Amino acid sequence: MIVLGRIVAPFGVKGWVKVHPFGDDPLSWGEMPQWWLADDADAPESAWQPVTLAGFKEHGAGLVAAFVGHDDRNAAEALQGRFIGAPREALPKPDVDEYYWGDLIGLAVVNQADEALGTVEALMSTGAHDVLQVRDGDDERLIPFVAAYVLDVDLAARTIRVDWQKDW
């Protein structure tokens, strides 16, 4: 299951909820008629419960959504804090040189000298660009996920090649 975001609060009295997205193109989720919800982002696939999308739109600087069968504020409050996910095959295909963060987690990171720098543990968004959090034992590197540093992403080989020195 790919985690897409989290329900952060109820919105209004008709069952709508505020959504905090974890990616940069959450409006594409509207193409999926069904979402999945779970209490834990790391929950096994069997713990994710499907919900049918009744509405989804931008609201101010955020997003709001409504689900079939969740028609009042009490129902929306019951969803607060739950994670939103979807199976990989339900997601829109990313464009060339675009990746779902979940596909990058666990990839090995090597530099141009073929030195192993570690494994992608997480990603974070800084506003300016995304950053790879690369773990190598007790060491952590933060590598900007931009073309100047990320030279190649090979999902099949499970590697990311970067222009980054081992001692940085």
Curated annotation (Swiss-Prot):
Listed GO molecular functions?
A: ribosome binding
Taking every annotated instance into account, which residue ranges of this chain make up the domain PRC barrel? 96-168
**What are the subcellular locations of this protein?**
Cytoplasm
Q: Which GO terms describe its cellular component?
A: cytoplasm; ribosome
Q: What processes in GO biological process is this protein linked to?
A: ribosomal small subunit biogenesis; rRNA processing
Residues that span the membrane, as ranges: none
Q: Record's domain comment?
A: The PRC barrel domain binds ribosomal protein uS19.
Q: Which NCBIfam families does the protein's record reference?
A: 16S_RimM
Subunit composition and interactions: Binds ribosomal protein uS19.
Family stated for the protein in its record:
Belongs to the RimM family.
User: What is the protein's given name?
Assistant: Ribosome maturation factor RimM
